[in-house]
Amino acid sequence: MYRYELHMHTKEGSACAVSLVEDMIKQYVKIGFSGAVVTNHFIRGNTCISRSLPWEQLIEQYSKAYTNGRKIAKELDFDLFFGIEEGYGNGKEFLAYGFEPEFLLSRPFLRNADLNIWAQEIHSVGGFIAYAHPFRDRDYITNPDEVPDISIVDGIEGYNRGNRDIENEKAIRVFGNEDTVITAGSDLHSTDFDSAYGIETQHRIRSNEELVKTLLERNFKVYL
């Protein structure tokens, strides 16, 4: 069996993270994971990258966790993927996978894009988009009980390790009977963990295309 983390933050990109990508990878290997997606906060979230930078420089710096992590990932036979976590208003966020940093680099208009545009562009390159931790109730989130429009995205992060149980339970209760992909992710920001959420598969995932295909075909089990 192979286990993959779908929600990981690192110090290179997220202001709230404390561990570097190399150390995060080593810890995931230690607990038996086969791979992870780097999903640092982008410019409408808690990023540590200056939003005033020219687009090319912004993307270069934002992508450092992924580019820096590939060497150690290769050495440890760990499958590392690029992704994002981005805000779409009122403190709410989405996760996206299935593309390389060049996807962002070639689309400077995404600096001011709304959720619909993001979804259209992600789907145009065969990517996957999901609501992150729906129904999370925090001071910075406006109207946490609002049910998001599921028709825009491919799935939801139904199990988030950083959520309260009641928040995850509501996500499963609301969306469990919908035709949407339900994933799991840890939302970890440091190496201070000895277990993690994710997906478990019977096959190894080696490419963006395989990751998206696995998710869309629901060819996995959530791992908690």
Per-range role (PLM):
Residues 42-157, 162-163, 214-216, 220:
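Extended substrate/RNA-proximal surfaces in nucleic-acid metabolism proteins
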Residues 2-4, 35, 128:
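Structural motif
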Residues 33, 78, 177-180:
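A short helix->loop->beta-strand "cap" motif at the edges of active sites that frequently abuts
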Residues 1-14, 20-26, 90-102, 120, ...:
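Charged catalytic cores and adjacent phosphate/nucleic-acid-binding surfaces used
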Residues 23-39:
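Catalytic domains of carbohydrate-active enzymes, especially glycoside hydrolases
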Residues 18, 59-63, 205:
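Short, conserved loop/turn and helix-capping segments at secondary-structure boundaries
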Residues 37, 81, 130, 181-183:
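Structural detector of well-ordered beta-strand residues that form the stable sheet scaffold
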Residues 10-11, 34-47:
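Ser/Thr-glycine-rich phosphate-binding loops at phosphate-binding pockets of nucleotides
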